[in-house]
């Protein structure tokens, strides 16, 4: 929780990228999100080693799958890696998740209680990613590739 919620919250508080006129409201919204994630989090998850950024863009195919971009590898619930493979609308994601879990269970039992963690994990990823962008802003590639981050419209939304 610290790495994905509390440390990013501190980054937001000290960031000069968030327009000062919007910072108070943004921090209030971040605090509400953090409280909601904490309220929904439960300790029923089985913790194991994860890729941490497991989406289709980090799987290369040549003679079989090869996972790349392991800098986010960490411990957490299996669903953390599985939900990131989902795409499409809710119905498509539900079917995809059923298929992924069925395949997962060919190798290891899946704790279905973890499904309730998808939305909290999604929120945590969003908060963490935004703080990561802010931390990296001094890299010349970031303002060039993420120009929307300095726009007031982004922070207002």
Segments the model singles out, each with a brief description of its role:
Residues 1-3, 113:
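Conserved ATP-binding subdomain of kinase catalytic cores across diverse folds
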Residues 69-74:
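Activation of the activation-loop gatekeeper triad in protein kinase-fold domains
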Residues 50, 66-68, 80:
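Activation loop entry of protein kinases
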Residues 4-52, 62:
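An alpha-helical support segment within catalytic cores of ATP-dependent transferases
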Residues 78-109, 125-141:
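Active-site activation/catalytic loop segments of kinase-like enzymes and analogous catalytic loops
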Residues 16-17, 21, 131-157:
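ATP/Mg2+ or Mg2+-diphosphate-binding catalytic cores
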Residues 112-122:
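All-alpha amphipathic helical-bundle segments outside canonical DNA-binding/catalytic cores
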């Amino acid at each position: 929780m610290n790495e994905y919620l509390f440390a990013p919250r501190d980054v937001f508080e000290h960031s000069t990228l968030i327009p000062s006129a919007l910072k108070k409201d943004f921090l209030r919204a971040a605090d509400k999100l953090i409280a909601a994630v904490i309220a929904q989090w439960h300790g029923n998850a089985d913790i194991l080693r994860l890729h941490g950024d497991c989406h289709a863009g980090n799987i290369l195919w040549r003679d079989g799958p090869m996972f790349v971009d392991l800098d986010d590898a960490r411990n957490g619930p299996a669903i953390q890696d599985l939900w990131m493979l989902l795409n499409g609308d809710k119905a498509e994601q539900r079917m995809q998740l059923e298929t992924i879990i069925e395949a997962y269970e060919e190798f290891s039992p899946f704790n279905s209680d973890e499904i309730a963690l998808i939305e909290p994990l999604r929120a945590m990823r969003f908060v963490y990613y935004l703080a990561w962008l802010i931390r990296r802003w001094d890299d010349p590639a970031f303002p060039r590739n993420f120009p929307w981050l300095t726009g007031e419209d982004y922070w207002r939304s």
